[in-house]
Amino acid sequence: MWTPPRNDQQYLNWQWYSSILSSHAAMCGCPDAVAHFNHLASVLRAPQNPPPPGPQRNLPLRRLPALPAAPEAPGDRAPWPMAGGAEGEDGGAGGDADHGGAAGGPEDADLLDAVAAAETRPQETQEGHRGVPLQPRRGAKRKLTFPPSQAPQTSPPVGRLAAGGKRVAKLRGRDADRLPAAQAAAAATANPGSQTQTPVQPSPKNPPKSRYQPYLVTKGGGSSILISNSTINMFGDPKPYNPSSNDWKEEYEACRIWDRPPRGNLRDPPFYPWAPKENQYRVNFKLGFQ
């Protein structure tokens, strides 16, 4: 969508002239850009048309150039070079070599036979004892395989000492059935009537008497307390407490601070007369639930 220019002609000319001065200052150090431009205009004159383009080259981008053509495979194997002068000097020897004669000597003939045998020999492949070619995988651990005839012999079973100090060998597989314990178990399975009867467990209604029986401890006032001797004190039996002078000093110091009467027995809870009394609730009816 066309819009009217935001700047007038004078301001546009000033921007163009400023751009020329800035570009000249970026590439040249002379102080007069106008004189430099006039000198270039007189020397170079009007710009000529661009030269015609050359032959178009359709080169593939980001692609490797094609490899050169492979050389032609030779038909027959080149003859072995003859020992001696040029071919034209001894024509008779060359004729013998062309007809299958050994012009180079017996050593050269043996070497040619060895090379021909090596080329015609089939490539050998390493195979395992089952005929499967061994192809080690990269990063896999090598595992030793032995043919049945070369399998390593296992060590004999290690013995153990019996109760009498005699060494008894460990039996494996079918030999373990000949042990006395195994024979006794097999005989018991065959004759179920001869097995020992399992004793009957006592009924829960008549449990056996516990070895821990409670006993009564009578105080000086004649009241008795039921105490069970099955109770275990984690810190041991309590010892008689005999307060020292320091304990009584701390007791009277606490009485002065908390404004309470002293205790006769330091194990008794303290009494604070100024503390509010606990609310006592008395219920004169019973709640029945059905």
Swiss-Prot record:
<feature type="compositionally biased region" description="Basic and acidic residues">
    <location>
        <begin position="121"/>
        <end position="130"/>
    </location>
</feature>
<feature type="compositionally biased region" description="Low complexity">
    <location>
        <begin position="181"/>
        <end position="190"/>
    </location>
</feature>
<protein>
    <recommendedName>
        <fullName>ORF2/4 protein</fullName>
    </recommendedName>
</protein>
<feature type="region of interest" description="Disordered">
    <location>
        <begin position="67"/>
        <end position="218"/>
    </location>
</feature>
<feature type="compositionally biased region" description="Polar residues">
    <location>
        <begin position="191"/>
        <end position="200"/>
    </location>
</feature>
<dbReference type="InterPro" id="IPR004118">
    <property type="entry name" value="HEV_TT_vir_Orf2/Gyrovir_Vp2_N"/>
</dbReference>
<dbReference type="Pfam" id="PF02957">
    <property type="entry name" value="TT_ORF2-like"/>
</dbReference>
